[in-house]
């Protein structure tokens, strides 16, 4: 199986950065991208000519803020009317619109046309990029992957992430929780030195999400005891506070409001992100942005103390899930053997300090790389699930939990829980319900997730009707409802009337915002089309480069006395004119088609090559070897650099 399918990879699909790993040669390799970076920005940009993903997209964001999309993870699996989506929209430079089924759609301009994308499609583009990074490294096509999600992601967010995988053309072997993946990285790292059962708390604070999980690890068994978190808290929120602070400072100093200018805000945000990172290692830093707004330069200093003060409520908010998680796991904080830090935002000294104080001064574990631990664990799980691991990992067993209670609505809008939160998955629970009134012909099964006593305060996942119940007094019919959660944390619900044998079932996939099979197929086709367009752009650039290279090489070759001196003035002029014509043509036709570049190069070669070849034959004498030295202009060789008037 391992050979036919190629290797399976592990992808940490992050809010701000993503990372990919693979199990190879008895260990995990975290794979660098084409820029040499081991993490890739989760950014997709659309321009008049092309689509950019990753570093290329993030690097041009200040020039093109309206059409550069990021934070898709803060939209995925959420409804447009969700308050967090509405709040985020105020901060994003790109436009998000609603749709008839309350699904947020990202609106951008691509090649001069308005296009709408779902969060799943944007995430799928990032997944494709991560797959390509892995394929370039492994040298073969990759089909199978394990993709991670925050432990506190709900059912619809998980399903939407799985759909993103399908659109990207990946076969998602499993959706696993980020803290659990990080625990695998920690567990393998510490495997040799440990005996007996260990309680480990994973504190995962990333760019956009926050999770806390408690696991017991023993002999390769990773059992999650409890999980808690906030799917909308992370490094970006700390950046936002700093951006707001400097916007008001700019207003105070210059009496001008930059909050309506997307480009100025983006440049400020980039500077704030950099300043935040610097403040993790120094006590004070400066922000310097030339001509930020209406020609005004902006210089400001910020101290670590000021940064901590403006985010203090958010830092404290990070401690609440830690307490909740310990309570749910029924573990006292003194019984936690190791506190493991994951996610880039755990580098913030104040977060360290608060966590250390909470655990009464206990040393925190910093032995695993906070940016790569999740992808590392996902790669291990991918190897196990695809049967490619070795004895080192084969005996690993992951027992994860469902983060939110699941149940259905009974008379009076009461939430009746079938599966309490922190139940180990996969799991299956059945319960018998009955009718509420005499001769009731059917029952409406409404499935909710959440911890509140009334369903109106919880999240509706989906509903379906079980009809065809024979007339009977209330309380007589027996309706058996079965909740079944698979290993991805995705729920199936079925209901059956025991007496009449009527059955109905639903895969709870948040019917409202869920993509249908047809929509996913259409998006897969779109994705293939965009990929083909990207390839086309790449070919154009290569053809243009090839022609440019050849023309400049030729120009330099005839300037070289050793060669130019051997040409007759006529021949020299002929080549010079042809080269100048080609360079002129290039300047006016940057956007030409591939075949135009190729024809132009053939035309130029047709003029130059015979003259150069003749010269070499003359130089070599009859029967002599043709010297192919450094002087011969090879297409693709770097030009000689000299002053050209």
From Swiss-Prot:
Biased composition (Low complexity): 627-639
PROSITE patterns: HSP70_1, HSP70_2, HSP70_3
Origin superkingdom: Eukaryota
GTP-binding is among the record's keywords: no
Any one GO biological process: protein refolding
Pfam family, one: HSP70
One GO location term (cellular component): cytoplasm
UniProt region (Disordered), positions on chain: 620-645
Gene Ontology molecular function terms on file: ATP binding; ATP hydrolysis activity; ATP-dependent protein folding chaperone; heat shock protein binding; protein folding chaperone
Keywords for this protein: ATP-binding, Nucleotide-binding, Stress response
Classification via InterPro entries: ATPase_NBD, Heat_shock_70_CS, HSP70_C_sf, HSP70_peptide-bd_sf, Hsp_70_fam
CDD domains recorded: ASKHA_NBD_HSP70_HSPA1
PANTHER family referenced in this protein's UniProt entry, alphabetically: HEAT SHOCK PROTEIN 70KDA (PTHR19375)
Family indicated by similarity: Belongs to the heat shock protein 70 family.
Identification of the protein by name: Heat shock 70 kDa protein
Organism: Glycine max (Soybean)
Native organism taxonomy: Eukaryota, Viridiplantae, Streptophyta, Embryophyta, Tracheophyta
Gene responsible for this protein: HSP70
């Amino acid at each position: 199986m391992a050979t036919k399918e190629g290797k399976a990879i592990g992808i940490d699909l992050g809010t701000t950065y993503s990372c990919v790993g693979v199990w190879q040669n008895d260990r995990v390799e975290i794979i660098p991208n084409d820029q040499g970076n081991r993490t890739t920005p989760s950014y997709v940009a659309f321009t008049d000519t092309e689509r950019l993903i990753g570093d290329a997209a993030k690097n041009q964001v200040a020039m093109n803020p309206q059409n550069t999309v990021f934070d898709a993870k803060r939209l995925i699996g959420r409804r447009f009317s969700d308050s967090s989506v509405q709040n985020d929209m105020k901060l994003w430079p790109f436009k998000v619109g609603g749709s008839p089924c309350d699904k947020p759609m990202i609106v951008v301009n691509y090649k001069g046309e308005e296009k709408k994308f779902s969060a799943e499609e944007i995430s799928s583009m990032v997944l494709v990029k991560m797959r390509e990074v892995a394929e370039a490294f492994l040298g073969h096509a990759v089909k199978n992957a394990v993709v991670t999600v925050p432990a506190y992601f709900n059912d619809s967010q998980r399903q939407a992430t799985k759909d993103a995988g399908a659109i990207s053309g990946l076969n998602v072997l499993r959706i696993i929780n980020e803290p659990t993946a990080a625990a695998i990285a920690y567990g393998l790292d510490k495997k040799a030195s440990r005996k007996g059962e260990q309680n480990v708390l994973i504190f995962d604070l990333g760019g956009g999400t926050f999770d806390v999980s408690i696991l017991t690890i023993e002999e390769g068994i990773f059992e999650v005891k409890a999980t808690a978190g906030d799917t909308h808290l992370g490094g970006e929120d700390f950046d936002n506070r700093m951006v707001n602070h400097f916007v008001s400072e700019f207003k105070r100093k210059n009496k001008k409001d930059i909050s309506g200018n997307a480009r100025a805000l983006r440049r400020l945000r980039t500077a704030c992100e950099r300043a935040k990172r610097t403040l993790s290692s120094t006590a004070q830093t400066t922000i310097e942005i030339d001509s930020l707004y209406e020609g005004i330069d902006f210089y400001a200093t910020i101290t670590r103390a000021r940064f901590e003060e403006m985010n203090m409520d958010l830092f404290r908010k990070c401690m609440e899930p830690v307490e909740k998680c310990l309570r749910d796991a029924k573990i006292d904080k003194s019984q936690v053997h190791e506190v493991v830090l994951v996610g880039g935002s755990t580098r913030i000294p104040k977060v360290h300090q608060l966590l250390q104080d909470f655990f009464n001064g206990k040393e925190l574990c910093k032995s695993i790389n906070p940016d790569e631990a999740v992808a590392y664990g996902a790669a291990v799980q991918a190897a196990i699930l695809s049967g490619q691991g070795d004895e080192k990992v084969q005996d690993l067993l992951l027992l994860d939990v469902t983060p939110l209670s699941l149940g259905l609505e009974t008379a009076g809008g009461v939430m009746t829980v079938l599966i309490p939160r922190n139940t180990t998955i996969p799991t299956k629970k059945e319960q018998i319900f009955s009718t509420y009134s005499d001769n009731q012909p059917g029952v409406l099964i409404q499935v909710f997730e959440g911890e509140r006593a009334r369903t109106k305060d919880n999240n509706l996942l989906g509903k379906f009707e079980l009809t065809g119940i024979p007339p009977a007094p209330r309380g007589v019919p027996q309706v058996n409802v079965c909740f079944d959660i698979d290993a991805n944390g995705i729920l199936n619900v079925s209901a059956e009337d025991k007496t009449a044998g009527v059955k109905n079932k639903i895969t709870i996939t948040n019917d409202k915002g869920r993509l249908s099979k047809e929509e996913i197929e259409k998006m897969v086709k779109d994705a293939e089309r965009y990929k083909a367009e990207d390839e086309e752009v790449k070919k154009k650039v290569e053809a243009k480069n090839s022609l440019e290279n050849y023309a400049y090489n030729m120009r330099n070759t005839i300037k070289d006395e050793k060669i130019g001196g051997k040409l007759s003035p006529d021949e020299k002029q002929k080549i010079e004119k042809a080269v100048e014509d080609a360079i002129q043509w290039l300047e006016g036709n940057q956007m030409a088609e591939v075949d135009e570049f190729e024809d132009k190069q053939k035309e130029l070669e047709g003029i130059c090559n015979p003259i150069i070849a003749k010269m070499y034959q003359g130089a070599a004498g009859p029967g002599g070897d043709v010297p192919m030295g450094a002087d011969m202009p090879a297409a693709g060789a770097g030009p000689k650099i000299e002053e050209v008037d």
